[in-house]
Design a protein with these regions (language model features):
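Bacterial N-terminal signal peptides that target proteins for export
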Residues: 1-10
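A structured beta-alpha segment of the ubiquitous adenosine-cofactor-binding alpha/beta core
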Residues: 114-137
């Protein structure tokens, strides 16, 4: 077979595989128009309205259940201790000992002990409780959608650490549930609420910069020191999931830290929208060295 024929054969395989690959990644219908992937926007049911401006009755006390108390969850419990008018009702993690460890945070802040839930489906029992208003989700990424969906289906508001979902089907399902139940479903993009970002947003909204027509942002986070935790593939403590995403996917896996504050300044979904998105990355320069370090 000539080189040209071999090249054409390889290209044919790539293009035949591309739709299946993209469909699996998006888990959603799409078309390709002029070289761009265009995803479908689902039709709302009659009478169903957006939840972007949703307000709910004020609560004298917000009763919270936490799901996911590994690396990030305990610090979330700590932060909630500084918010007046809250009650921590339940703590849940795959491992009971991690949920139990957070009881000390409550004791140190003169709060009563919370109920403990554990195991792969402990969150389901937590979400069924009648005395919880909001479920705070800090699990591994694969469980963000599952817990948020369960929370809203059981009448609870959902607050989800980044990312809120991992494909378009999950994203649209959460939007649909929030609109139908009239419950808040919030992605906790913390970079939108730091002092610098909020100050910049306030200045933009007050016209200090005039008409904002261009914005640029970035997020840099050195994660090499976390590899000793992330490397625990199939570990009992479930920390090995993180590196799977870096291994299996390209582009920007964590775009919202840099993009979120910009979207607020540009009034995205509040009068404007994004029409085209492009994601790319460089090759991994240190990944191979770290893999060799942890595998020998």
């Amino acid at each position: 077979m000539t080189k040209n024929k071999v090249l054409l054969a390889l290209l044919a395989v790539v293009f035949l595989a591309l739709p299946q690959s993209l469909c699996a990644q998006f888990n959603w219908k799409y078309t390709v128009e002029k070289g761009k992937i265009v995803t479908e926007v689902p039709q709302r049911a009659p009478g169903q309205t957006t939840a972007l401006q949703l307000t709910t009755p004020k609560m004298p006390v917000v009763r919270v259940g936490f799901v996911g108390l590994g690396m990030r969850g305990p610090s979330a419990v700590e932060r909630w201790m500084h918010i007046p008018g809250i009650e921590v009702v339940a703590l849940c993690d795959y491992e009971a000992k991690r949920a139990e460890a957070c009881q000390k945070i409550l004791r140190d802040n003169s709060m009563p002990a919370a109920a403990i839930y554990s195991g792969e489906e402990g969150y389901k029992e937590l979400c069924k409780r009648k005395d919880i208003d909001l479920v705070y989700i800090a699990t591994d990424w694969d469980h963000h959608f599952l817990v948020a969906k369960c929370a809203m289906e059981n009448g609870k508001h959902a607050a989800i650490e980044v990312p809120s979902a991992i494909n378009l089907r999950e994203i649209w399902t959460l939007i649909d549930l929030s609109e139908k139940t009239r419950l808040h479903c919030v992605m906790l993009e913390n970079c939108c609420y730091d002092f610098f970002e909020l100050n910049s947003l306030n200045m933009a909204q007050k016209g200090v910069f005039g008409d904002v027509i261009y914005a640029q942002g970035a997020y840099k986070h050195e994660l090499s020191s976390f590899w000793k935790y992330y490397w625990k593939k199939n570990a009992q403590d479930k920390l090995g999931w993180r590196l799977e995403y870096n291994k299996d996917y390209r582009g920007d896996l964590y775009a919202t830290h840099g993009l979120g504050p910009i979207a607020q300044v540009l009034n995205i979904h509040r009068g404007d929208r994004m029409r085209t998105l492009v994601a790319m990355d460089t090759k991994s320069f240190n990944g191979k060295k770290l893999v060799e370090k942890y595998t020998g």
